[in-house]
DNA sequence: ACCATTTAGTTAGCCGGCTAACTAAAAGCT
DNA sequence: AGCTTTTAGTTAGCCGGCTAACTAAATGGT
C-alpha cells in the first residue's frame, strides 16, 4: 500500500496547491459577485483600459473563445462594455464601467487576504525565496509552451 | 502606466504558474486520451483500488457531483468500473479495469516529464527548497479551508 | 416498531478552460 | 482591380470544477 509515488512529486504538490489557492481566491471573490478567473480580465483593464479582445486573450494566456464568453458575462453584470474598434471592423475594444472600476479596491483586497492565508507563518526570507522560485518556474513553463 | 500592483503578488504569480502547469500536464496527458484532472482519480485507485465514490471525492478534495461526472466518463472510456457496495445499497465501489491499470506507467511518465520542464535549470538545492515551501503553503491552504 | 435525521449519489445548471469549425473583415499578391 | 491568405471573433460542444435541489438508503431516538 503506501501512497503512490506520483503524490510525492513537486508537480503533484503544485497542482494541489493551485487547486486550493484557486478555491480560496474564488471564495473571497464570490463575496463581490465574481467568479475566479474573471478578476484576471479586470486586472488587465485596470492596468490598461480599452484593450482589444485578442489582446486580452494574449495577456491572460487564454484562447479566444474563453474571452468571448467571459466578456459576455462580464458585460451582462455591467462591469465591462464592448465598443467597436473604429480602425478595424472585425475588432472591438473593452472598457470598464464605473462598477468595473469600483471593484479594483475590493478585489485587490481579496488577493491580499488570500496571500496572507497562503503565506501564513512564513518569515520575510521564506516569502521572498518562494516568490523568486515561483518566478523562475513560471519562466520555465512559459518558455516551454512558447517553444511549441 | 506600469503593471497593476496585483501582478506583483506571490499569489498572482502562483495562479499563473498553476494555469501554465495544468496546461502543460494536460498536453502530455492528452496523448493518452486523458483530460487533466482525470489522472487524479486514477492515482487514488492505483494506490487503493475499490474506493467508494464519496471517499474519492474526499481524497481529491472535490465535490460529489464532480466525481459523478468524471466516473461516468472514465467508465465510458473503459478505464474504470463501478460495482455496488454489498454493505451499503446507496453506495458503490470503483475498480480499475486492465486499461486503467495499464495507464499507470505512461501517466507517471507524464508527471515526470512535466516536472522536468517545471524545474528546468534548477539545482538540487533549489528544487528541495521549492518542494518544502510548496508543502508548507499547502498546509496553510488546507488548514484554512478546514477551519470553515 | 416508527419516524426524523443524516448520509451517499445524482441531476440540473452555471463558470472558466479547451479544440474544431465557422464567418467576416483586413492585408497581400499579381 | 481581383483573388488568396491571414487575422479577429463567434459558435458549438466537450471537460473539470462548483452550488442548489433532489432521491433513496442507512442510522438514531423515542
Predicted segment positions?
Chain A
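N-terminal leader segment of winged-helix/HTH proteins
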Residues: 1-32, 148
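Pre-recognition alpha-helix immediately N-terminal to the DNA-recognition helix
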Residues: 9, 13, 24, 40-46, ...
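Short capping segments at the starts of secondary-structure elements
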Residues: 48-52
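Charged, amphipathic alpha-helical coiled-coil/dimerization segments
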Residues: 22, 72-135, 139
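Short, locally clustered residues in the helix-turn-helix/winged-helix DNA-binding domain
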Residues: 15-18, 43-47, 108, 135
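Residues within the alpha-helical elements of helix-turn-helix
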Residues: 44, 59, 77
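Residues within helix-turn-helix
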Residues: 53-54, 65, 72, 92
Amino acid at each position: 500500500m503506501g501512497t503512490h509515488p506520483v503524490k510525492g512529486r513537486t508537480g503533484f504538490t503544485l497542482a494541489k496547491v493551485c487547486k486550493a489557492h484557486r478555491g480560496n481566491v474564488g471564495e473571497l471573490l464570490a463575496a463581490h459577485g465574481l467568479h475566479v478567473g474573471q478578476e484576471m480580465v479586470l486586472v488587465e483593464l485596470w492596468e490598461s483600459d480599452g484593450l482589444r479582445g485578442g489582446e486580452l486573450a494574449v495577456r491572460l494566456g487564454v484562447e479566444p473563445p474563453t474571452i468571448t464568453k467571459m466578456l459576455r458575462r462580464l458585460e451582462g453584470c455591467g462591469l465591462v462594455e464592448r465598443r467597436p474598434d473604429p480602425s478595424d471592423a472585425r475588432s472591438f475594444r473593452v472598457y470598464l464601467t464605473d462598477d468595473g472600476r469600483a471593484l479594483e479596491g475590493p478585489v485587490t483586497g481579496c488577493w491580499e487576504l488570500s496571500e496572507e492565508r497562503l503565506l501564513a507563518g512564513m518569515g520575510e526570507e521564506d516569502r521572498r525565496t518562494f516568490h523568486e522560485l515561483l518566478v523562475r518556474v513560471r519562466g520555465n513553463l512559459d518558455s516551454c509552451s512558447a517553444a511549441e
